[in-house]
Amino acid sequence: NEAVEHAEIQMLASIFGAITLLCWITFRSWRAVLCVIVPLVIVTIMCNALMALLGIGLKVATLPVIALGVGVGVDYGIYIYERLQHEMTHAGLPLREAFYEAMRQRGTAAVFTAVTMSIGVGTWVFSALKFQADMGILLAFMFLVNVLGAIFLLPALAVWLGVGSEEKAPQQELAHS
């Protein structure tokens, strides 16, 4: 169990490290990185809590479940954040309107993907194999809660972190010069 716990820490550090690096390269903003990463971290903690609640032990077989859930879940955040950033940068929209446009353009696809995938893996709950049933519960949970994090937590973090203000501040200073 100690070896599996150590492996989980290494796996999560590797996954979140890679996501952080790729988000930084893609968006060139620490605010963007936090907007994408924080919901994923929270859902990962919630998944571990669900495992404890349901008595699903942390085993070599269950380690990849969280990695897969994070790997798919990051897509939802990236879909929405990319569109949010695009609408603010190219269309000049304020954050609230940019989020509306991001949801209009990418939200339906993200929700459809999450629901479809959750239903697909959710059917595994009826499997006679306990491992497959456990995976179905955990993956369906992660897919759905990750999309909810991207829809609700990501924009809240964007507002709290002042996304969009980092581009406007230098422009406002130039305008006052």
Protein language model features and the residues they cover:
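Cytosolic juxtamembrane regions of multi-pass inner-membrane proteins
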Residues: 68-112, 120, 124, 161
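Alpha-helical transmembrane segments of multi-pass membrane proteins, especially transporters
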Residues: 36, 40, 67-68, 101, ...
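Residue-level signature of transmembrane alpha-helical entry/exit and packing/kink sites
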Residues: 11-15, 32, 36, 63, ...
